[in-house]
């Protein structure tokens, strides 16, 4: 009795080869084109709103400069009030602050969790994709889209706020906007792309850990909120050693870290003087053209008090941006690498 065997031919060898990256990219595009379109539509709508508001802001600022600098002309006060009031659209950037965490929760968290929850990932692995190649093919294109889109939005936000950062504004009494303000710092420069990328990486890792979409979204929101709070409250102020000064005239664009008072070289109190102390020594209004804080500091200095301030000058903005962007990029790479490792080790 003869047993017939079949030799594997070239066609069978071809079926054992890994799927080319180009084909995997095509599959990823078909699976996530709706997500990519949603990202583009969401960021595009924000960009249009910024552009329209920015045009009005820049026109109002140009009119204010023409009427108030270097020679003050009729209508200057009204134009100053008009320009100052226009900042309500994006007061401290709060309107755009949720952008990174929304991307992490609704783009990053479902990208792996949805297939793990439904079980469709097994089909991809049996078609020659492989676990780590399947994971990278899903994460990398979306990560690039997220970073590019939010980076462009950050550039547009910087353009929108450019008139508010001008040093000449203090001449008009226009309230200054610090580039370190929460919500503004996070969404401008390098930080705009790296915060969104970190949120996306957090979401992807949450998806592989909990393996269900809704719990992954909740975990992403919680983890991102904790990271953002810790960064703003404890880390960012100490990227570089704060400067120390006893001069009360600090630019409004600087970031005030802490303030305290001494009297006769001994600590007196923190923060703003008490009402009773002000009434005792400085119950007169400050001289014309002088701010209340500056006038109070000078008045109390005549009674032996000195105001000490630690602060970060606005000139350090880009140094802080590169420091924060660097560690966020490293964190994102670590989270994505951990996600790939977990897919290879844990997913079944």
Feature map (PLM): residue ranges:
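Long, hydrophobic alpha-helical segments
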Residues: 91-120, 147
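Short alpha-helical transmembrane interface motifs in multi-pass membrane proteins
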Residues: 89-93, 102-106, 183-188, 320, ...
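Aromatic- and glycine-rich beta-strand/loop motifs that create alpha-glucan
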Residues: 2-44
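Hydrophobic alpha-helical transmembrane segments of multi-pass membrane transport/permease proteins
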Residues: 34-71, 96-105, 219-231
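Secretory targeting signals
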Residues: 6-13, 44-51, 84, 140-211, ...
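Helix-loop-helix units of permease transmembrane domains in multi-pass membrane transporters
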Residues: 111-141, 343
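Terminal transmembrane helical anchor/hairpin motif
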Residues: 3, 17, 53-84, 168-177, ...
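Cytosolic juxtamembrane amphipathic/interface segments immediately preceding
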Residues: 15-31, 82-86, 130, 134, ...
């Amino acid at each position: 009795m003869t047993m017939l065997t079949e030799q594997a031919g070239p066609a069978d060898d071809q079926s054992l080869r890994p799927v080319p990256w180009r084909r995997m990219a095509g599959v990823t595009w078909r699976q996530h084109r709706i997500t990519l379109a949603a990202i583009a539509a969401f960021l595009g709508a924000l960009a249009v709103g910024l552009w329209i508001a920015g045009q009005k802001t820049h026109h109002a600022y140009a009119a204010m400069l023409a009427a108030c600098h270097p020679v003050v002309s009729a209508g200057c006060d009204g134009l100053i009030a008009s320009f100052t009031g226009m900042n309500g659209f994006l007061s401290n950037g709060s309107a755009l602050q949720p952008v990174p965490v929304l991307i992490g929760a609704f783009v990053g968290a479902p990208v792996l969790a949805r297939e793990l929850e439904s079980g469709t990932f097994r089909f991809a692995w049996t078609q020659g994709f492989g676990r780590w190649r399947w994971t990278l093919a899903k994460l990398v294109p979306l990560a690039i889209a997220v970073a590019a889109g939010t980076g462009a939005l950050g550039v547009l936000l910087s353009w929108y706020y450019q008139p508010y950062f001008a040093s000449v504004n203090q001449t008009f009494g226009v309230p200054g906007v610090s580039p370190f303000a929460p919500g503004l710092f996070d969404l401008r420069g390098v930080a705009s792309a790296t915060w969104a990328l970190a949120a996306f990486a957090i979401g992807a890792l949450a998806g592989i850990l909990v393996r269900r979409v809704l719990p992954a979204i909740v975990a992403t929101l919680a983890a991102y909120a904790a990271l953002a709070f810790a960064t703003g409250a404890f880390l960012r102020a100490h990227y570089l050693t704060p400067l120390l000064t006893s001069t009360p005239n600090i630019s409004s664009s600087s970031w005030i870290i802490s303030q305290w008072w001494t009297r006769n070289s001994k600590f007196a109190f923190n923060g703003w003087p008490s009402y009773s102390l002000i009434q005792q020594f400085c119950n007169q209004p400050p001289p014309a053209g002088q701010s209340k804080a500056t006038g109070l500091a000078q008045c109390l200095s005549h009674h032996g008090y000195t105001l000490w301030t630690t602060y970060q000058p606005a000139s350090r903005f880009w140094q802080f941006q590169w420091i924060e962007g660097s560690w966020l990029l490293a964190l994102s790479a670590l989270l994505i690498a951990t996600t790939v490792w977990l897919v290879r080790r844990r997913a079944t």
